[in-house]
Amino acid sequence: MYILTDKVATELKKPFGKVYKELNSIEGKVISIGDVTTKHLLSNGIVPDLSILDFKTKRNVPVEIPHKFKTVFEVYNPPGYISDEAIERIKYLSTIDDRDMALIVKGEEDLLTLPVIKYFPEDTSVIYGQPDEGMVVLKITKELKQKIEKLLKDMEER
């Protein structure tokens, strides 16, 4: 289990990729993290391979996603943490070649971007929300995986 530190929280406030207000198409394997981001993609006809959701935005505002996912998994992940359960589930999901899956998080999904980048293959597109700015779109690369490893090392581990 990883616990967010102030140092890592400061780093995570900066987008890891380009920020978009709109996104109408994207190629290849797509992982969407966050409810508003997923809702935007689905409303534009983009069905992510995996959507990671907690059905809330800004920690407590409910978000309705009018979409029936093909396969749904659940995981517990408290705010400010990356739980062992979430890590194991993301590892498992990274091995499945399927589309339209959802990982429903009881707690908070924000930090799960880190294990997604760590475990999903290079060239996977990861899209997550940057509060009050838009959606961050990035491709997983070897360099990005190394950056994530460093951030995880800077978190408190239990």
UniProtKB/Swiss-Prot annotation:
Binding site for GTP: D35, V36, D54, K56, E109, D132
Class of the enzyme per the UniProt entry, highest EC level: transferase
Record carries keyword Nucleotide-binding: yes
E.C. designation(s): 2.7.1.237
Transmembrane portions of the chain: none
GO biological process terms held by the UniProt record: coenzyme A biosynthetic process
Entry keyword set: Coenzyme A biosynthesis, GTP-binding, Kinase, Nucleotide-binding, Transferase
Any GO MF annotation of the entry: GTP binding
Source superkingdom: Archaea
Catalysed conversion reaction: 3'-dephospho-CoA + GTP = GDP + CoA + H(+)
Record flagged with keyword Cell membrane: no
Pfam hit, one: DUF359
InterPro entries per the UniProt record, alphabetical: GTP-dep_dephospho-CoA_kin (IPR007164)
Metabolic or biological pathway, per its Swiss-Prot or TrEMBL entry: Cofactor biosynthesis; coenzyme A biosynthesis
Family: Belongs to the GTP-dependent DPCK family.
Cited function: Catalyzes the GTP-dependent phosphorylation of the 3'-hydroxyl group of dephosphocoenzyme A to form coenzyme A (CoA).
Protein name: GTP-dependent dephospho-CoA kinase
Species annotation: Methanococcus vannielii (strain ATCC 35089 / DSM 1224 / JCM 13029 / OCM 148 / SB)
